[in-house]
Amino acid sequence: MPKRRDILAIVLIVLPWTLLVTVWHQSTIAPLLTTHKDDGRDPRREAAPGADPREYCMSDRDIVEVVRTEYVYTRPPPWSDTLPTIHVVTPTYSRPVQKAELTRMANTLLHVPNLHWLVVEDAPRRTPLTARLLRDTGLNYTHLHVETPRNYKLRGDARDPRIPRGTMQRNLALRWLRETFPRNSSQPGVVYFADDDNTYSLELFEEMRSTRRVSVWPVAFVGGLRYEAPRVNGAGKVVGWKTVFDPHRPFAIDMAGFAVNLRLILQRSQAYFKLRGVKGGYQESSLLRELVTLNDLEPKAANCTKILVWHTRTEKPVLVNEGKKGFTDPTVEI
């Protein structure tokens, strides 16, 4: 058995050599490890020695901002010289969900070829929010504005039922079309009044594109029903209306349920939505009776048996905590 003195001598001899080998190993391997880590190209690794760590955060933030500013919407399909243009007329007004509604609608319209979006704001001037959104979409658009006079609105939360929201804005769009295209224009096109809170199937736009005079189809979630629809006979002609609310209206149809040939709009220059003396639910009739008769209507969507548009409504956000304790920045655009 080795003596204690011999064990101590062995330890004193081996320990220095162990330390030397360890130091040598570290000095050889460390540069290799550093090289592998730098391959990740972390900007923090590339910073100069002694630099302020906050500068790394600022650098990262700048990179993120560049990515954001370079983002663009998917561009619409290439323009075709053979397809009729669909002129989509959308009245809009300032409210918390306006940008969300217009963004959702833009994402639908971006898939439709040969589309011109006529957005008309109920405002004394065009707002920066809507202008930026339209510019960023890449859609072919026209941005108009006209403010509904106060005497056309009731004081308080309710509005005069004789002056439905969007009437003056739709009329301005009709005037713009007549001032832009000559009365005898050969430009093929279709005009569709599409509110910004509805939901639209892409199939709907292809259905309406072949409109000769006025085409019609069902609309879901209107009149207290799952859907309202034109009544079509076996010969494919519209003979009435499947609706509960005042079915004897000349055209008992929702604003989202019809499209008009552009040439008809140009030729019938007297046709507008009436501002006064029109009962609730008769706004559509006030325009259509100046354009066609019941016999002229063209049923679409499989003889008005398919639902391709839904009168959805976005729930009004409850912002009861807004402005409390500085949680949100009022300058942030929503």
Segments the model singles out, each with a brief description of its role:
Residues M1-P53, V64-E70, P247, M255-I334:
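C-terminal catalytic/acceptor-binding lobe
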Residues P161, E179-N184, Y192-A194, N198-Y282, ...:
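Conserved catalytic core of nucleotide-sugar-dependent glycosyltransferases
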Residues V14-L15, D62, H87, A100-R104, ...:
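Acidic, Ser/Thr-rich intrinsically disordered and amphipathic helical segments
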Residues P84-I86, L109-L118, L139-T142:
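Short loop->beta transition adjacent to catalytic acidic/histidine clusters or analogous donor-positioning motifs
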Residues R95-P113, R125-L133:
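Short, well-formed alpha-helical segments that are part of the catalytic scaffolds
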Residues D81, H87-R95, V120-D122:
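A conserved hydrophobic helix/loop-capping motif in glycosyltransferases and polysaccharide synthases
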Residues D122-G189:
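Active-site-proximal specificity loops/subdomain of glycosyltransferases
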Residues Y93-V97, P124-R125, D197-Y200, Y272:
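Short acidic, S/G/P-rich loop/turn micro-motifs used as interaction or catalytic elements
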